[in-house]
Regions:
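Structural motif
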Residues: 10-24
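C-terminal outer-membrane beta-barrel translocator/porin domains of Gram-negative envelope proteins
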Residues: 504-527, 531-544, 601-602, 640-747
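Structured extracytoplasmic
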Residues: 96-250, 256-264, 325-438, 442-445, ...
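Residues that define the transmembrane beta-barrel architecture of outer-membrane proteins
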Residues: 450-454, 483-487, 545-549, 606-612, ...
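Short, acidic Ser/Thr/Gly-rich low-complexity loop/linker segments typical of extracellular
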Residues: 34-45
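Short loop/turn motifs that connect adjacent beta-strands in outer-membrane beta-barrel proteins
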Residues: 119-121, 413-416, 425-435, 448, ...
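A short, solvent-exposed loop/turn motif at the edges and junctions
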Residues: 31-32, 58-70
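Transmembrane beta-strand segments that form the barrel wall of outer-membrane beta-barrel proteins
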Residues: 97, 282-287, 433-446, 457, ...
């Protein structure tokens, strides 16, 4: 099943060119009548191991006439043979078609009519796989965003050219009845002797599917297959001609988009007459196909006949090109399939519904002798050199003195660290890590309670060994107007399971005094409030001081199930405004008191509160990759369910709270394929007991009264911060967002050139007919230039129980952007 090798096998090797001597990269060489074969490398060089015997060898390349060779080869014999392929001579077979249409239309109707048959005919599939991933740079800038690019460390030459990624793997793949399993036998990663490559190979891109999903990062809508049931709505087809290959007539059909900016392919497909199946294809998607992240992706596939009416994949090559930040990348991802078996049941022991990929022990420890014999595709000279050079570079980079020099260089403070991102300090051997915040993430703020305040925050991670660590966070804060100094800290002991990644437990303690918003979800970011206070005279931020003493425990089971518990003491202290300074004119409005007017009915004074809480979340459907030494969870596509309960405990330590509060939520992001994505966050909850409830304990919604958007699917864009706070026994909350991802806008001339996407949806909070808030919005996402498409602009309309409808514009950072910007700090209560 795998790409095996034998000391008694003969070797057929050579080069594949066209008539002019030009190399034919990744041409296919195989034993006629079987699926045993190989592929040439990028220079057309091939090598095929054969047991002693007599064979008919076929060589083919898309767009060229197949060539064959008959030979007898002995054990340990090497035969040199160079294939020279001629252009495919095409002829036009007569077809009974409408006078007004291209003959390709008749052929494509036949192919589309058999699409589902070919999609479903393979119920069980087994194959050996060889994959080689190569990513090179043709151009590298000297600096990116002000940071120098170290070309030497990346293994590039002085011109910035070279190989960035080189991986080869050999595996066996099984699929049966909706289950799949990949067993990786060997892997080699240039520059990393411990590298494990990729646990899941690039999938066979089945053009028999209506919608081709390659990657959510490329296009979450997927692409329309030329064999789609409604392909004629998206494509034009032109018959280029036909040719004979053995007993088969093969049609070459040119595939063309009907309209620009549709998620479609262009290129050529080759179709087998009467079988109406794919013979091979050469298709491309570009930016004009609504593709993100990369600039072009070319896909080549070659199929071989396994039996009558059944053609199976032999080879798939992906050619991406990417231009970003001055880099120019190109690559090839070659996957060769060998010894395919169709509809032969695999043993039940092969499949484990949870483990989808598994590595053999020592998979990444194979020596060069193994790879020289096992690899079916000869390495290029530059690839062989890259393996050697990267090994030499690695040995140099692993020297203690070099590692220490890199660490010292990394630890040098930079001006940019003060402004955005914060400063990071790495200790020796990376056992200690310290991070700070920056100006744009909360280091300095302004509000009417404290005036100018300095609030440095520190987070640390100290690795004790491979399974145990200590993490901590500390924050200091000084308000220059009210003169209050606050300090708080949290420290955790974390134990991780060495054999099951993401499986851990954590226990910790928190203590100190700090300032907090009345809504513990921190709906208003301090940076945004600074802007609104200083320039618009809007002091939306309302704070109180609190002494904290908490015990925390969290356990993640590594299978989608996670729970946490906490028990703590609070002493809550009221605060008042201490300044009314603003750059804005006084006629723009006056500042409001620190106590929100909605809470005038509450007795807000110094008091103690003892609370306990537990939270449980579960996301079913986790699968796993089994590495030689550990298990790695693989993300699930199913919803996440969360249940939380909080208890206010009266009398203990003079606690003045007595309540029981719960909340249940479910959230998910569903692919609607060509229609985009549908994301939702639904929740319900309320109080079971309201004997003593104070302001921070209420049911709060995350409101927003700024032009800057608050987090999507978490908040209400035009709701006041505290108008809907309540202690009701039951409420319902829903956030729904349809991200069209180019659907509809790709038909509007200006918008499709700008690659702006529509987004629409709504937010609802409902207690009863006297207390509710509803929002509907429509917006433009993906706003920006080139790769910097980070903005989103919404028009929001609200209806509410106060009979005060609001229409407003909200400008935010797109949550679906490839490039993420993080401004402000919403990392926790403090």
């Amino acid at each position: 099943m795998v790409f095996s090798f034998s000391v008694s096998a003969g070797i057929l090797k050579g080069k594949i060119t066209d008539r002019s001597g030009e190399s034919l990269p990744f041409a296919t060489v195989y034993v006629h009548g079987t699926t045993m074969g190989t592929s040439a490398n990028a220079m057309g060089e091939y090598q095929l191991q054969l047991p002693a015997g007599t064979y008919k060898i076929a060589c083919q390349y898309i767009g060229y006439r197949q060539s064959s060779l008959s030979l007898t080869i002995g054990a340990d014999e090497t035969v040199q043979y160079n294939f020279q392929l001629e252009d495919q001579g095409l002829q036009m077979k007569e077809h009974v078609v409408k006078a007004s249409e291209d003959p390709a239309m008749y052929i494509m109707r036949k192919v589309i009519g058999r699409r589902k048959f070919h999609k479903d005919q393979i119920e069980a599939f087994q194959t050996g796989i060889y994959m080689k991933a190569l990513l090179k740079t043709r151009q590298t800038p000297d600096k990116v965003l002000g940071q120098k690019v170290n070309k030497e460390e990346a293994g590039l030459d002085s011109a910035g050219k070279g190989i960035l990624l080189l991986i080869e793997q050999i595996a066996t793949y099984y699929r049966q009845g909706g289950k799949e399993r990949t067993v990786i036998h060997s892997v080699r990663e240039s520059g990393d002797p411990n590298g494990m490559g990729v646990p899941k190979f690039p999938d066979v891109i089945s053009f028999y599917e209506n919608n081709i999903h390659i990657s959510s990062q490329l296009n979450p809508r997927g692409f329309v297959s030329p064999l789609n049931d409604f392909a004629f709505n998206f494509y034009k087809f032109r018959l280029e001609g036909d040719f004979k290959e053995g007993n088969h007539t093969i049609y070459k059909i040119n595939v063309m988009p009907k309209r620009l900016y549709e998620p479609v392919f262009s290129g050529n497909i080759y179709v087998v007459d009467e079988d109406w199946s794919l013979h091979s294809l050469d298709l491309t998607v570009t930016k004009k196909s609504n593709m993100e992240l990369i600039d072009t992706l070319r896909i080549e596939q070659v199929y071989l006949p396994l039996q009558r009416d059944l053609w199976v994949i032999k080879q798939q090559v992906l050619y991406p090109t990417i231009k970003i930040f001055g880099f120019d990348f190109t690559g090839s991802f070659v996957t060769i399939y060998n010894d395919q078996k169709v509809n032969e049941p695999a043993p039940d022991s092969i499949f484990n519904e949870k483990v989808i990929s598994e590595y053999d022990a020592g998979a990444n420890k194979k020596d060069t002798t193994y790879w020289s014999a096992a690899r079916p595709v000869p390495l290029l000279e530059e690839e062989a050199k890259d393996f050697q050079d990267k090994d030499s570079l690695r040995q140099r980079f692993e020297r203690p003195e070099y590692i220490d020099s890199v660490r010292r260089r990394f630890n040098r403070p930079k001006v940019s660290s003060l402004i955005i991102g914060g400063y990071t300090y790495r200790g020796k051997d990376d056992k200690f890590l310290l991070r700070t915040n920056a100006l744009l993430t909360g280091l300095a703020n302004y509000n009417t309670i404290e005036g100018l305040n300095i609030a440095p925050k520190f987070s640390l991670a100290w690795s004790l060994d491979s399974a145990n660590s200590i993490t901590g966070t500390a924050a200091l804060r000084y308000g220059f107007e009210n003169g209050h100094f606050n300090a708080i800290g949290r420290i955790n002991y974390v134990h991780s399971d060495r054999e099951w990644r993401t499986k851990y437990w954590s226990a910790g303690v928190e203590a100190g005094k700090y300032v907090f918003q009345f809504n513990p979800n921190n709906p208003l970011d301090a940076l945004y409030n600074t802007i609104s206070t200083l320039f618009y005279r809007r002091n939306y931020l309302k704070l109180y001081e609190r002494w904290n003493g908490y015990l925390h425990f969290t356990k993640n089971h590594g299978n989608g199930f996670r729970w946490s518990a906490k028990l703590g003491f609070q002493q809550r202290l009221p605060l008042q405004n201490s300044t009314d300074f603003s750059f804005a004119r006084e006629d723009m409005g006056g500042f409001t008191e620190n106590m929100p007017p909605e809470f005038k009915g509450y007795s807000w004074e110094k008091h103690n509160a003892v609370t306990a809480g537990i939270s449980i979340s579960y996301q079913p459907g986790f699968t796993y990759v089994k590495y030689p030494d550990y298990l790695q969870p693989y993300s699930s596509k199913l919803p996440t369910f969360t249940l939380a309960y909080e208890k206010g405990i009266p009398s203990v330590l003079d606690s003045k709270v007595d309540f029981d509060k719960w909340r249940f939520s479910v959230r998910d992001n569903i692919s609607l394929k060509l229609l985009g994505n549908l994301a939702y966050h639904l929740s319900t909850g309320g109080f079971l007991n309201t004997s003593q409830v104070n302001i921070p304990d209420l049911n709060h919604i995350n409101g927003n009264q700024l032009t800057l958007a608050s987090p999507y699917l978490e908040s209400f864009q035009v709701a006041p911060y505290y108008t809907y706070s309540n202690q009701s026994g039951l409420y319902g909350e829903a956030h729904l967002e349809w991200q069209l991802k180019g659907f509809l806008t790709n038909k509007i001339p200006l918008l499709r050139q700008l690659r702006w996407y529509l987004v629409t949806g709504g937010n609802v909070y409902y207690v009863d007919q006297n207390l509710y808030h509803t929002e509907a919005f429509v917006g433009i996402d993906n706003v920006g230039y080139e790769k910097f498409r980070v903005f989103r602009i919404d028009l929001v309309q609200s209806w509410n129980s106060m009979n005060l409808p609001v229409t407003a514009i909200r400008i935010g950072l797109s949550p679906t952007s490839i490039i993420r910007l993080n401004l402000g700090d919403r990392s926790g209560e403090w």
